Swiss-Prot record:
The gene is fluC. Keywords: Cell inner membrane, Cell membrane, Ion channel, Ion transport, Membrane, Metal-binding, Sodium, Transmembrane, Transmembrane helix, Transport. Belongs to the fluoride channel Fluc/FEX (TC 1.A.43) family. Signal peptide: none annotated. This is Fluoride-specific ion channel FluC. It catalyses: fluoride(in) = fluoride(out). It is found in: Cell inner membrane. GO terms for cellular component: plasma membrane. InterPro entries: FluC (IPR003691). Its main location: membrane. It comes from Thiobacillus denitrificans (strain ATCC 25259 / T1). GO terms for biological process: cellular detoxification of fluoride. Fluoride-specific ion channel. Important for reducing fluoride concentration in the cell, thus reducing its toxicity.
Length: 124
């Protein structure tokens, strides 16, 4: 139950941060959602930082890791999770695996988003 709450509370905070970044930054340049870009870049940076920190501090309770990584950064951006998976593969020397993960996520996401967008026409 503690893990469930850690993820949930972290996700709420991350989602509020993402929303706030959008409100603050998106009006500056409407053609490029800067709030989303900021959320993805900030999330990517912080997931790298906390992954390294948790690796150096193995005694930290798993609920803290769940709150920060799965909850907070996952709520801020799922891009941070994707980035962590690719960087983890690359730091293990798995260059092909890391590249395939990156390609699969990017291509899959773009294709799925396009399909979702255009499928609305058929659902009406």
């Amino acid at each position: 139950m503690t893990a469930f709450l850690a993820v949930g509370f972290g996700a709420a905070v991350g989602a509020w941060l993402r929303w706030g970044l959008g409100l603050w930054l998106n009006p500056a340049y409407p053609a490029m959602p800067l709030g989303t870009l900021a959320a993805n870049v900030i999330g990517g940076y912080f997931i790298g930082l906390v992954l390294a920190w948790f690796a150096e501090h193995p005694g930290v309770p798993p609920e803290a890791r769940l709150f920060v990584i799965t909850g907070l950064l996952g709520g801020l951006t799922t891009f941070s999770t994707f980035s962590a998976e690719v960087v983890t593969a690359l730091t293990r020397g798995l260059w092909l695996t890391g590249s395939l993960i990156a390609f699969a996520h990017l291509a899959g996401s773009f294709i799925a988003t396009g399909l979702g967008f255009y499928s609305l026409k058929f659902l009406k």
